[in-house]
Amino acid sequence: MHCPICHHRAHVVYCAHCINTSPSLLLKLKLDLILLKDENKELNGKVEQILNEAMNYDQLDIKRMEKKKDPLMNSLMKLDVLRMKKNNNLIRHRIEQLNERIYSKRNHISELKVEIDNYKCYKVGTGTDKLIEQVEISDAKNKLAQVSKICESVRDYKLNLLNNWFVIQKLQDNFQIPFAIAFQPLISLKNFRVLPLAITNDSINIMWKYISFFSDILMIKLPYTNKICEQPMFEFSDSIQTVVQRLIKLIINILQICRHLKLVPSTPMDIPWLLDQYDVDGLFYNMVKRNKMKCRSVSLYWTFGMLYSMVLDNMNNPQRGHPARRTAPPPTVTGPHDRWYVVG
């Protein structure tokens, strides 16, 4: 091949046919190829050795490695050193940032401590007073709870003794007199006209005594008191109107005690409906046993005059009450002081 400018031969070019058919040309090129392969193998071995030594240079003798002075190994070592420096710089920068944050937080903590100390010095008096007051209130509440439990147990014990003393009991198979107190029948609107006046007065007196003791144990003040002086058994001469008035006052006191014991609601009640369901003896017995009673609510409270008229109407109505009581035989004619109604 000739140069187009100077026309000198630069390279010798042979065609493929001549190369394949000429033994001298083929042998020479094959020998050159073999030599190149051997040189490549030798260079590959050196490169691998240099790479291995460069990767494990920290485990080899540095002076011995420096004596070799291989360019590739030196370049790789420099590259590792640069990488290490870069990592060290990043770590150093991160450490500096963390130190700055730590210093800023320390300064903030010290400022907060100063403020807390100032606040404590300012609020130490009021804080101590509040703490002492809370402790005293807690102790007082605990003592009050203990005293309340003791008072309730003592009250229950006294009420049980009072019930045993007055022998309050529920009679079986007796529709006319279902309840008894101190071996006397409990008065109701249904048996008021059946019992003699002396028995009625004695029963009301006993119920008044029980109500008085009951209110003393509960330490409550009743709307009415029994101001009528007690007379001997055979010298009682109260009229029916006076007995009815005492009975109404007794009903009001019973309802007041039931409200205090939360047996009935404190709101206005439908007293006629309540008496129709329980009657006076049922109210008294449920109060003694502290049983809750069903009630109907109304908008106005009942007065003494309204109750007086209602009680008189109920006692004068012969069609009122339980069928067994309405069909009961008429009372036996007795004297004013006959005690045949005493129950046992």
Swiss-Prot record:
Q: Which family does it belong to?
A: Belongs to the ATG14 family.
**Localization:** Preautophagosomal structure membrane; Vacuole membrane
What is this protein called in UniProt?
Autophagy-related protein 14
* Coiled-coil regions, chain positions: 26-156
Q: List the Pfam families hit by this protein, alphabetically.
A: ATG14
Q: Show the GO cellular component annotation of the record.
A: phagophore assembly site membrane; protein-containing complex; vacuolar membrane
The record's listing under InterPro entries reads: Autophagy-related_protein_14 (IPR023261), UV_resistance/autophagy_Atg14 (IPR018791)
Tell me the superkingdom of the source. Answer: Eukaryota
- Function, as annotated: Required for cytoplasm to vacuole transport (Cvt) and autophagy as a part of the autophagy-specific VPS34 PI3-kinase complex I. This complex is essential to recruit the ATG8-phosphatidylinositol conjugate and the ATG12-ATG5 conjugate to the pre-autophagosomal structure. ATG14 mediates the specific binding of the VPS34 PI3-kinase complex I to the preautophagosomal structure (PAS).
Give UniProt keywords alphabetically: Autophagy, Coiled coil, Membrane, Protein transport, Transport, Vacuole
- Segments spanning the bilayer are none
Q: How does it sit in the membrane?
A: Peripheral membrane protein
According to its record, what is known about the domains? Coiled-Coils at the N-terminal half are essential for interaction with VPS30 and VPS34 and autophagy.
Tell me, what is an example of a GO biological process annotation in this record? macroautophagy
Segments carrying the region annotation (Cysteine repeats) are 3-18
Q: What is its main location?
A: membrane
Task: Provide the assembly information.
Answer: Component of the autophagy-specific VPS34 PI3-kinase complex I composed of VPS15, VPS30, VPS34 and ATG14.
